[in-house]
Amino acid sequence: MIARNPIKQDPAMRNTQDDHSRFLSLVLRHQPETIGLQLDDQGWADIGELLARLAAKGRNLGRKQLEKIVLDNDKQRFAISEDGLRIRANQGHSIKIDLGLAACEPPDRLYHGTASRFLDAILAEGLRPGQRQHVHLSADGQTARKVGARHGKPVVLEIDARAMRQAGLAFYRSDNGVWLIDGVPPVFIRQTEAR
């Protein structure tokens, strides 16, 4: 019988880790200038420089803490390069970034979670990336429902990805499994129950 580790993470530490994760999202997805950081064309930042600039802004974060944030993030928002020297957000950028993703074949159906208050506009106008570079889609309805619940009463939309692909629209898949597309015309969208 294997004993479970009785040590639980201190809630204060969890909040600190969550706070660091949120701030990293801000810096690596939207506003690197907040700490004077420069991202390369593919969104990568030097880890040493990132940690130094965070410290200069009073956010002391060590290399091991950063790696823990990357590994523990339930949505796998961040990636560390194979050489271990750089970090980037996997998707969700509002700044111009080329993630270097190749177009790939999506499953026949993909899903998008939103709040009910946006439904009429989406069914009339389609899905647009808004301030982000891409519309984010999930491979399953349950994940989409969770995303929609963050914004209000959740609604799950089913996307006919097969028909979109046949119409020549390109899909990309980020390193953490989120499907990305420039937009979804309303003809390919229908409301559904999460599965």
Curated annotation (Swiss-Prot):
It comes from the Bacteria. GO terms for biological process: tRNA splicing, via endonucleolytic cleavage and ligation. The keyword Transferase applies. Its EC number is 2.7.1.-. Coiled coil: none annotated. The keyword Ion transport does not apply. Keywords: NAD, Transferase. Pfam families: PTS_2-RNA. One of its GO terms (molecular function) is tRNA 2'-phosphotransferase activity. Removes the 2'-phosphate from RNA via an intermediate in which the phosphate is ADP-ribosylated by NAD followed by a presumed transesterification to release the RNA and generate ADP-ribose 1''-2''-cyclic phosphate (APPR>P). May function as an ADP-ribosylase. PANTHER family: PUTATIVE PHOSPHOTRANSFERASE, TRNA 2'-PHOSPHOTRANSFERASE 1. NCBIfam families: PRK00819.1-4 (NF002014). Belongs to the KptA/TPT1 family. This is Probable RNA 2'-phosphotransferase. The lineage of its organism: Bacteria, Pseudomonadati, Pseudomonadota, Betaproteobacteria, Neisseriales.
